[in-house]
Amino acid sequence: MALRFPRFSQGLAQDPTTRRIWFGIATAHDFESHDDITEERLYQNIFASHFGQLAIIFLWTSGNLFHVAWQGNFELWVQDPLHVRPIAHAIWDPHFGQPAVEAFTRGGALGPVNIAYSGVYQWWYTIGLRTNEDLYTGALFLLFLSAISLIAGWLHLQPKWKPSVSWFKNAESRLNHHLSGLFGVSSLAWTGHLVHVAIPASRGEYVRWNNFLDVLPHPQGLGPLFTGQWNLYAQNPDSSSHLFGTAQGAGTAILTLLGGFHPQTQSLWLTDIAHHHLAIAFIFLVAGHMYRTNFGIGHSMKDLLDAHIPPGGRLGRGHEGLYDTINNSLHFQLGLALASLGVITSLVAQHMYSLPAYAFIAQDFTTQAALYTHHQYIAGFIMTGAFAHGAIFFIRDYNPEQNEDNVLARMLEHKEAIISHLSWASLFLGFHTLGLYVHNDVMLAFGTPEKQILIEPIFAQWIQSAHGKTSYGFDVLLSSTSGPAFNAGRSIWLPGWLNAVNENSNSLFLTIGPGDFLVHHAIALGLHTTTLILVKGALDARGSKLMPDKKDFGYSFPCDGPGRGGTCDISAWDAFYLAVFWMLNTIGWVTFYWHWKHITLWQGNVSQFNESSTYLMGWLRDYLWLNSSQLINGYNPFGMNSLSVWAWMFLFGHLVWATGFMFLISWRGYWQELIETLAWAHERTPLANLIRWRDKPVALSIVQARLVGLVHFSVGYIFTYAAFLIASTSGKFG
C-alpha cells in the first residue's frame, strides 16, 4: 500500500477513489503539506530543484542553437538579414500534400520549414556569432552546463552537501552574492564579451579563441584606463554610414553615449550597450559590498528595516518585525520575486520594440509583434502569481504578534479603505471609458461622426515633448530648440536621441491622439480591476466580516458546507482564479492596441488607426475582422497556402477556449452522474470490461474543475491570438 502514488501523502495514497491521482498531482509541489517534511528538507528540496530548472533552461536554449545550426539558414541570413527569412527548423510531416510541401519550402530551404519569429537570429548575429560552427559550439557548451546543473542538483541532495537552514536564511550573504556575483560580475563579463567579440564582429573583425589574445578591442589597449583618460574610449565612434558587420564606416570607440539608433540596423549602438552594461556592473559590484557579513562592516538588513519608523507616528511601528517575517516566509519572498520579475518582463516587452537592442530586429515586423505579445502575456501570469503567493503568505506564514502595528498589520487594518478606493477607480474608469466609446459608436451609426467626443491626450503629449518630440509644438524642455538642455544634448550627451525621437521610422514615442487616449483608459480599467480582485483576495485571505475564520480553511476551499450560506467563491484561490480572466482581458486590449497601431505604422496608413480606434465597431471591423481575412483563407476548397497552419491553429485555439466553459459552467453533480453511467456502460461492454481499475471514478472537486476550465480558457485564448497575430503580420510583411 505504501508504494502507491502519492508517496508524499499516506492519507491520499489510501484514498479509494480517483481523487488520489488528481489531488496527488495538485499537491506534488506543495512541499509544505507533505508527510514528514521539516523546514530543513523544505529549503533543501527547493534549492536542489532550482538546479533542475537551470538544466531545463540550458537544454532548451541548446536545442534552439542546435536546430538552427542543423536545419536553419543562419549563414545565408547573415549575408542578407533584411531579405532572407530565418528558418527555425525543418518540418517532416507525412500528411503534407504537394501544395503544402511547396507552400512551406521557404528561406532557401530544400524542403518544408518553419520560419523563426523569435528573434534568435538577430540576437546571435548582434552578439558576434557568424557561422553554423559557432552555433554548434554554443549548443554543446550549453548542453555541458545543463549536465553540470543536473549533477549539482543531485549533489546538493546528498547528506554531506545539503546546506543548513541558517545558510538559507543568511540574507546579507545572499544579497551580496546575488548583487555582486549574479548581476555585477555577469554584467562585467557581458561588457567584456561585447567589447572583445561583438563590437569587433560588427566592424568585420572575427574574434575567436584562437586570436582572442592578439586582437586589441581598442587601438590604445588598456592605456587610457590606467592613465585616467577614459574619454578616449568614446572617441571615433562608428559613423552614420557604417555598414554593420563590415569595416566600412566603422570607428574605434568601445564605450559611447551616442543615443538613438544605428541608421542601417535601426537598433541601439553596440558601443552604447557595452557602456550601459559596464555602468550596471559598477553599480552592482558596489551594491554587493554593502551588507554586513563576516567582517562586521556594512549594513544589517534587520537594523535598516527596524530604523524605518516614520517620526510622525502615522505608520505605527513602521518596518519593525518585517525582517523576520520576510526571512522566514518562502511565500513572501516568492511573492516579492514574482512581482519584480513580472514588472521587468513587461518592461522587456516595452523596450524590445521601442529601443531595439538587436541588429535588424526592428525591420522584422512579425518577430517584433510576437516578442511584444509573448512578454506581455508572461508578465501577466507572473504578476498574478505574485499575489497568489502573497495570499498564501497571509494564510500560512503571517504572525500577528510579530507584526503588531507595523506597515503589514496596518495594511490589513485599513483594507476596507484600500479595496473600496480601488473599486471606485475601476468603476470610474470603466463607465467613463465605455461611455465615450459607446457615444462615439452611436454617432457613427447615426451618420454624424463629427459629433464624436475626441479627447486629445495633452498631458502625455507634453511628457513626450519634454523628452524631445517636437511635432506637437509644445516648445518645452528638450523640444525647446532655444533651451540649454536641447543645445547640450546636441553635443555633450546622447546626440542621437533627439533625431531618433523625431524620426518616423521607429517606434520611439509614437504620435498619440484621441484613439490612444481611449484605449489607454480601457487598459487602465483592466489593470485596476485585476489589481482590485488580487488585492482583495490577499487582504481578505485571513478573514472578513462575512467569514472571520477563513484562514482555518486554507488557501483554496470551495465553500464551508451547505449550512453556512455565502461562503462559496471567497477563498484566496477564487480571487486568483477570477483575476486571471481579467488579466487575460487586459493583455488582450494591450496587445490589440500595440499590434493595430504598429500595423498601420508599418503600412504607412496611420490614419486608419487614428480614425477607427475611437469607437468599438472600428476595433471589431478594422482591426479584428479586417486582419483575420487572410488567416481564415489559409485553406479553403480551392487549395491552401503557408498561412494554413495558422488558420488551423486559430480554429483549434477557439475549440480549446470553448472547451474551458464546459468545466466552468457545469459542476460536480452533473459529471458524477455522467461518470457513473459511463462506468456502468464500460462494465457491460465486451472486451472493454477486461480492463479494470482499483480507484472508484469520481468527479473533479469544484476547485479542480475551475482550474481545468481556467487552463483551457487561457491556453485557447493565447493560441487563438498567437495564430491571428503571426498570420496577419507575416501575411502582410513576409
Curated annotation (Swiss-Prot):
<feature type="binding site">
    <location>
        <position position="671"/>
    </location>
    <ligand>
        <name>phylloquinone</name>
    </ligand>
</feature>
<feature type="binding site">
    <location>
        <position position="568"/>
    </location>
    <ligand>
        <name>[4Fe-4S] cluster</name>
    </ligand>
</feature>
<dbReference type="GO" id="GO:0015979">
    <property type="term" value="P:photosynthesis"/>
</dbReference>
<keyword id="KW-0603">Photosystem I</keyword>
<feature type="transmembrane region" description="Helical; Name=III">
    <location>
        <begin position="175"/>
        <end position="199"/>
    </location>
</feature>
<keyword id="KW-0560">Oxidoreductase</keyword>
<feature type="transmembrane region" description="Helical; Name=I">
    <location>
        <begin position="46"/>
        <end position="69"/>
    </location>
</feature>
<dbReference type="GO" id="GO:0016491">
    <property type="term" value="F:oxidoreductase activity"/>
</dbReference>
<comment type="function">
    <text>PsaA and PsaB bind P700, the primary electron donor of photosystem I (PSI), as well as the electron acceptors A0, A1 and FX. PSI is a plastocyanin-ferredoxin oxidoreductase, converting photonic excitation into a charge separation, which transfers an electron from the donor P700 chlorophyll pair to the spectroscopically characterized acceptors A0, A1, FX, FA and FB in turn. Oxidized P700 is reduced on the lumenal side of the thylakoid membrane by plastocyanin.</text>
</comment>
<feature type="transmembrane region" description="Helical; Name=VI">
    <location>
        <begin position="369"/>
        <end position="395"/>
    </location>
</feature>
<dbReference type="GO" id="GO:0016168">
    <property type="term" value="F:chlorophyll binding"/>
</dbReference>
<keyword id="KW-0408">Iron</keyword>
<comment type="similarity">
    <text>Belongs to the PsaA/PsaB family.</text>
</comment>
<dbReference type="Pfam" id="PF00223">
    <property type="entry name" value="PsaA_PsaB"/>
</dbReference>
<feature type="transmembrane region" description="Helical; Name=IV">
    <location>
        <begin position="273"/>
        <end position="291"/>
    </location>
</feature>
<dbReference type="GO" id="GO:0009522">
    <property type="term" value="C:photosystem I"/>
</dbReference>
<dbReference type="InterPro" id="IPR001280">
    <property type="entry name" value="PSI_PsaA/B"/>
</dbReference>
<feature type="transmembrane region" description="Helical; Name=V">
    <location>
        <begin position="330"/>
        <end position="353"/>
    </location>
</feature>
<comment type="subunit">
    <text>The PsaA/B heterodimer binds the P700 chlorophyll special pair and subsequent electron acceptors. PSI consists of a core antenna complex that captures photons, and an electron transfer chain that converts photonic excitation into a charge separation. The eukaryotic PSI reaction center is composed of at least 11 subunits.</text>
</comment>
<keyword id="KW-0472">Membrane</keyword>
<keyword id="KW-0602">Photosynthesis</keyword>
<feature type="transmembrane region" description="Helical; Name=VII">
    <location>
        <begin position="417"/>
        <end position="439"/>
    </location>
</feature>
<dbReference type="GO" id="GO:0009535">
    <property type="term" value="C:chloroplast thylakoid membrane"/>
</dbReference>
<feature type="transmembrane region" description="Helical; Name=X">
    <location>
        <begin position="643"/>
        <end position="665"/>
    </location>
</feature>
<dbReference type="GO" id="GO:0051539">
    <property type="term" value="F:4 iron, 4 sulfur cluster binding"/>
</dbReference>
<feature type="binding site" description="axial binding residue">
    <location>
        <position position="654"/>
    </location>
    <ligand>
        <name>chlorophyll a B1</name>
    </ligand>
</feature>
<keyword id="KW-0249">Electron transport</keyword>
<keyword id="KW-0934">Plastid</keyword>
<dbReference type="GO" id="GO:0000287">
    <property type="term" value="F:magnesium ion binding"/>
</dbReference>
<feature type="transmembrane region" description="Helical; Name=XI">
    <location>
        <begin position="707"/>
        <end position="727"/>
    </location>
</feature>
<feature type="binding site" description="axial binding residue">
    <location>
        <position position="662"/>
    </location>
    <ligand>
        <name>chlorophyll a B3</name>
    </ligand>
</feature>
<keyword id="KW-0813">Transport</keyword>
<keyword id="KW-0157">Chromophore</keyword>
<keyword id="KW-0004">4Fe-4S</keyword>
<dbReference type="InterPro" id="IPR020586">
    <property type="entry name" value="PSI_PsaA/B_CS"/>
</dbReference>
<keyword id="KW-0148">Chlorophyll</keyword>
<feature type="binding site">
    <location>
        <position position="559"/>
    </location>
    <ligand>
        <name>[4Fe-4S] cluster</name>
    </ligand>
</feature>
<dbReference type="GO" id="GO:0009055">
    <property type="term" value="F:electron transfer activity"/>
</dbReference>
<keyword id="KW-1133">Transmembrane helix</keyword>
<feature type="transmembrane region" description="Helical; Name=II">
    <location>
        <begin position="135"/>
        <end position="158"/>
    </location>
</feature>
<feature type="transmembrane region" description="Helical; Name=VIII">
    <location>
        <begin position="517"/>
        <end position="535"/>
    </location>
</feature>
<keyword id="KW-0460">Magnesium</keyword>
